């Protein structure tokens, strides 16, 4: 298993970094699941797993601020347009058949809100979120766009 760590920020050196990341390579699905069971659901880190590569990221205060701003904007827009949305925060989006897992900073069901209303989210049985928000200050070794795309989260990259 290979290990990489990164703690960087776009702020000056004396500032607190926005996030810290650890990358583990060669992690089997069973090892990943055992680790997740050990650390539990109530944790401050976010995870992403892509076919043997595991990223554990600890967000700091600066990392959280854009998520809050974007969430407020989405909620205000939905209220103005009078549409129902369901915000689920840092929900674990998992597909064992694809060997992929990701936890966005926050996510929203907008178009598919009625399909998940009152349900526990299991991507085997319900559609993925319509919007996933990622606030990244450092470059991840994992391509989260590929993970989201494989899970079926709508994606459009502006070029």
Identify the function of each model-found stretch.
Residues 1-159:
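Gly/Pro/Ser/Thr-rich low-complexity, intrinsically disordered segments predominantly at protein N-termini
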């Amino acid at each position: 298993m290979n290990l990489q760590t990164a703690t960087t920020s776009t702020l000056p050196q004396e500032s607190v970094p926005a996030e810290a990341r650890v990358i583990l390579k060669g992690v089997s699905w069973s090892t990943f699941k055992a680790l997740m069971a050990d650390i539990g659901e109530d944790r401050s880190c976010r995870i992403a797993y892509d076919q043997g590569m595991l990223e554990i990221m600890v967000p700091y205060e600066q990392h959280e601020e854009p998520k809050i701003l974007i969430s407020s904007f989405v909620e205000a827009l939905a209220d103005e347009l009078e549409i129902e949305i369901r915000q689920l925060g840092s929900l674990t989006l998992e597909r064992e058949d694809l060997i992929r897992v990701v936890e966005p900073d926050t996510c929203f069901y907008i178009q598919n809100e009625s399909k998940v209303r009152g349900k526990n989210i299991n991507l085997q049985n319900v559609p993925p979120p319509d919007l996933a928000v990622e606030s990244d200050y450092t470059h991840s070794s994992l391509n989260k766009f590929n993970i989201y795309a494989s899970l079926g989260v709508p994606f459009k990259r502006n070029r």
